[in-house]
Amino acid sequence: MAAYKDLEQQYGQTMEEHSFLPDPENRRYGSMGLCWRHSSRQGGGFFWTYGQQDLYTIKIHDFFFHEDQLLEFHWPESLSVTWYESISGEEFSPCRRLVPGCVKSFIGGREPYRALIHRHIPIVSIGVEITPAYYRDYLRRQFPEEYQSLLESFQTLDQTEHFPEMVQ
């Protein structure tokens, strides 16, 4: 139950601002993690998260909007990689299209993430967000000889449609 409280504390305010409410009994994506339900005049669907201490969070997006939505999030410092099965829209910084079938990286803790999401196109994706405690500390301790900066790797990934290891 402590994990649910941590997830609610981390995402709760942002989710509520976008009409998502905690749905802790929902087991749609498994018994672990926390699911939020979006059911309003704006759209519908689910957002699910599972976090492991302060190391990483797995996220599933499965929702839609009836009208175009401008979203803005202030992410904490983290490295995020997400595969989009379905999406349509534009990111603003850097300016690029959001298209299905691509893998995108995002580095949190810098500037706010801003995107325009197009109406009636479901956002269906799965992503992993890695915290500094994991990519700076844990990996360096576990693999001192092989350790390379994940931050540098994420900066080079950016956006690609060729990442078979992630989508198989």
What role is predicted for each listed range?
Residues 1-80:
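N-terminal low-complexity or simple alpha-helical regulatory segments
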Residues 9-10, 56, 87-89, 139-140:
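Generic low-polarity alpha-helical segments
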Residues 32, 43-44, 88, 100, ...:
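Feature targets compositionally biased, intrinsically disordered low-complexity regions
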Residues 56-59, 69, 85, 101-104, ...:
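Functionally constrained cores in energy, signaling, and assembly domains
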Residues 58, 66-73, 89, 114, ...:
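Residues in flexible loops and secondary-structure boundaries
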Residues 58-59, 81-83, 125-129:
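Short hydrophobic-aromatic micro-motifs
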Residues 65, 75-94, 132:
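Glycine- and acidic-residue-biased ligand/ion/polar-headgroup-sensing regions
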Residues 92-168:
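Alpha-helical bundle regulatory/interaction domains
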